[in-house]
Curated annotation (Swiss-Prot):
Residues annotated with N6-acetyllysine modification: 127, 332
Cell compartment(s), UniProt: Nucleus; Cytoplasm, Cytoskeleton, Spindle; Cytoplasm, Cytoskeleton, Spindle pole
Species name: Bos taurus (Bovine)
A GO cellular component annotation in the UniProt record: spindle
Chief location category: nucleus
Subunit structure of this chain's protein: Interacts with AURKA. Interacts with importin-alpha; leading to inactivate TPX2. Interacts with HNRNPU; this interaction recruits HNRNPU to spindle microtubules (MTs). Interacts with BCL2L10. Interacts with KIF11.
List of residues that carry Phosphothreonine: 59, 71, 146, 296, 326, 456
Biological process per Gene Ontology, one example term: cell division
Biased segments, Polar residues type: 109-118
UniProt name for this protein: Targeting protein for Xklp2
Placement of covalent cross-link Glycyl lysine isopeptide (Lys-Gly) (interchain with G-Cter in SUMO2): 434, 457, 598, 697
Keyword Cytoplasm annotated: yes
Chain positions with Phosphoserine modification: 120, 124, 251, 268, 316, 443, 695
Molecular functions (GO terms): importin-alpha family protein binding
């Protein structure tokens, strides 16, 4: 697969230089002549006199003596050819314990030379490219060869983990190194198994000595940061502020990394007391103070000035015997006030309450001294219950009906009255017939608008004059006396229940006295107590407080948070493992059409190297002006459309008014109807016979 055959053919121009045919000694100096000629042709332009001359303001693109300063262009090669070249360059980086299959692949790639690509490069650029790639591959092989130290503890959440993404080449090299190491380990295991199988069960087998664990130094991420210790910093110097405004501080020097000193982890511990500490043995305060002073270093203790002043050797210090005195302890002032009352205080309070209580004796009932059986008072005999009938409404209605019937049953006698004479003289009870006025014929009012004739004075009925009646003359025999309203003044009384409360209290006292007189208490003597045995109530001993551990909410939240944090770390590690796993994508480069450069069509002025061609531009004002014109045009069209619609509506309304006026005029013209002709009325005699009168047949059997 090192050599790829393509089915594409190109019709490219043949005016190019074949760099493979050139010799290194002859044409090394003139190797870039073709590029200089092209640059000189581009830099020529026609002057004022018509002659062509070099462009004075610009330097030529390339010079013959500047080969190494030009950055080499990378060829567009196939991935397989590129991989073959890199495998040739990695010879030195591959260790000697690689598998033979890898060597076979390398020999096949060496035997098949890479075909020269279509695009050409200068030899100087090609050499520089090869040297740089060799150095790059060596550095990568060294990095991959060094053992990778994986931190056992994942980084904390607050630390920012800088992920350095590796290229596909580095990932491939790492994968290859891992595979080589696995093959070497498998080979060693196979050899050991082979020796064990050949030796058999009877022969002693030499145990393979396991390699000693090599100590690996700790590699802290913080060592990569450049830090300056505060002790090593220079002393503060007074500097002029204005002169140092534009000066930037010098970059810190790269500190050489030394060996990391292995130190034990100093993990933070909470200062909260646990249950075991609180339940420890009791330690007196004096011992605690003494232990605290012993723990404190001597350099933190305050020294007494008297100790510094040494006594003179001439004077002898006389020791005086001192009497022991009790120390003035301050602990009694630190006692808390006792809120619970003692038993003596409680007994004193009960005694005071007993002394304050006054016994009120009741009056002596004289019947107790008189003697005889004391019987309870006989209750008063209540009168028998008198039955009271119900006063129902239905009974009232029945009584009213009976009374009405009695009134109706009264005997009625008929007394005739004289007949009025008016009945004989004239018609009585029939109203007089009103005489209607004779109808006066009048011509119809067709010419008027509403066809209604205005009423004339003759048509108006004569209104009857209103009769004015005089008021009766008042009687002046008695003088007029106006009625004076009686003054009713409401007296305001205070709202109080004093009188009613006093009456109730008197009634209550009276009732209590009656009850006391009625119920005489019976004397019952208590037996004499036995003083031999004293029965006291059992003393209630309270149970001691049971010590229980605190169930704090913070502990529960801490456990929950630790669980979630662990779950997040597991998820992050899983994602990192998935990201580190390499998955190759399918090779689509083989089936794709290769890149074909297209020649750009440029003018002579644009073809000049380094020339600045003014690109077309559009001002924002012009754009806004065009938009404004379009907006005004649209607004004018809308206004014209509105005016046209209004004009059409006005014309339509005028036509409707004209049609309505013509219709009204046509309706107002009178057209006389012809006289109607009716059929004559023929009087015919009736065919029915005359009514024969028949006397009624009255029956008297239903009469009472």
């Amino acid at each position: 697969m090192s050599q790829v055959t393509t089915s594409y053919s190109y019709d490219a121009p043949t005016d190019f230089i074949n760099f493979s045919s050139l010799t290194d000694e002859e044409d090394m100096q003139h190797i870039d002549s073709w590029f200089d000629e092209k640059a000189n042709l581009e830099n020529k332009f026609t002057g004022k006199d018509g002659t062509g001359g070099l462009y004075q303001g610009k330097t030529p693109l390339r010079k013959a003596n500047l080969h190494r300063d030009v950055t080499p262009l990378r060829p567009v090669d196939n991935t397989y050819n590129k991989q073959a070249e890199k495998e040739n360059l990695v010879e030195e980086s591959i260790p000697s314990n690689e598998c033979p299959s890898m060597k076979v692949k390398e020999t096949t790639s060496r035997n098949n030379p890479v075909q020269p690509q279509r695009r050409s490069l200068r030899l100087s650029a090609k050499k520089n490219l090869e040297q740089k790639e060799k150095q790059h591959v060596k550095m990568k092989a060294k990095r991959c060869g060094t053992p990778v130290i994986i931190n056992e503890f994942p980084p904390s959440k607050k630390m920012k983990v800088q992920k350095i993404l590796k290229s596909t080449e580095e990932q491939e090299l790492e994968k290859r190194m891992k595979m080589q190491q696995e093959v070497v380990e498998m080979r060693k295991r196979n050899e050991e198994f082979k020796k064990f199988a050949l030796a058999g069960a009877g022969q002693p087998v030499k145990k393979s000595v396991s390699q000693v664990t090599k100590a690996v130094d700790f590699h802290f991420r913080t060592d990569e940061r450049v830090k300056q210790h505060p002790k090593n910093q220079e002393e503060y110097k007074e500097v002029n502020f204005t002169s140092e405004l534009r000066k930037h501080p010098p970059s810190p020097a790269r500190v050489t990394k030394g060996c990391t000193i292995v130190m034990p982890f100093n993990l933070s511990q909470g200062k909260k007391r646990t249950f075991d500490e609180t339940a420890s043995t009791y330690v007196p305060l004096a011992q605690q103070v003494e232990a605290f002073h012993k723990r404190t270093p001597t350099r933190y203790h305050l020294r007494n000035r008297k100790d510094d002043i040494m006594p003179l050797p001439s004077k002898s210090v006389v020791r005086i015997c001192r009497d022991p005195q009790t120390p003035v302890l301050q602990t009694k002032h630190r006692t808390r006030p006792v809120t619970c009352k003692s038993a003596a205080d409680l007994e004193a309070e009960e005694l005071e309450k007993q002394q304050q209580y006054k016994f009120k004796a009741q009056e002596l009932d004289p019947r107790i001294l008189e003697g005889g059986p004391i019987l309870p008072k006989k209750p008063p005999v209540k009168p028998p219950t008198q039955p009271v009938g119900f006063d129902l409404e239905i009974e009232k209605r029945i009584q009213e009906r009976e009374s009405k019937k009695k009134l109706e049953e009264e005997h009625y006698e008929f007394h005739s009255r004289p007949c009025p004479t008016k009945i004989l003289e004239d018609v009585v009870g029939v109203p007089e017939k009103k005489e209607l006025p004779i109808t006066v014929p009048k011509s119809p009012a067709f010419a008027l608008k509403n066809r209604i004739r205005m009423p004339t004075k003759e048509d108006k009925e004569e209104e009857e004059p209103v009769m004015i009646r005089a008021q009766p003359v008042p009687y002046f025999g008695m003088p007029f006396k106006p009625q004076i309203p009686v003054g009713r003044t409401v007296e305001v009384c205070p709202f109080s229940f004093d009188s009613r409360d006093k009456e109730r209290q008197l009634q209550k006292e009276k009732k209590i006295k009656e009850l006391q007189k009625g119920e005489v208490p019976k004397f019952k003597a208590h037996p004499l107590p036995h003083f031999d045995t004293i029965n006291l109530p059992e003393k209630k001993v309270k149970n001691t407080t049971q010590v229980e551990p605190f169930c704090l909410e913070t502990d529960r939240r801490g456990a929950l948070k630790a669980q979630t944090w662990k779950h997040q770390l597991d998820e992050e590690l899983k994602q990192q493992k998935e990201a580190a796993c390499f998955k190759a994508r399918p090779n689509t480069v083989i089936s794709q059409e290769p890149f074909v450069p297209k020649r750009e069509k440029k003018s002579v002025i644009e073809g000049l190297s380094g020339s600045l061609v003014q690109e077309p531009f559009q001002l924002a004002t012009e754009k806004r002006a065009k938009e404004r014109q379009e907006l005004e045009k649209r607004m004018a069209e809308v206004e014209a459309l509105k005016a046209q619609q209004l004009e059409e509506a006005r014309q339509q309304e005028e036509e409707q008014q004209k049609e309505e006026l013509a219709r009204l005029r046509k309706e107002l013209v009178h057209k006389a109807n012809p006289i109607r002709r009716y059929q004559g009325v023929e009087v015919k005699s009736s065919d029915q016979p005359l009514t024969v009168p028949v006397s009624p047949k009255f029956s008297t059997r239903f009469h009472c």
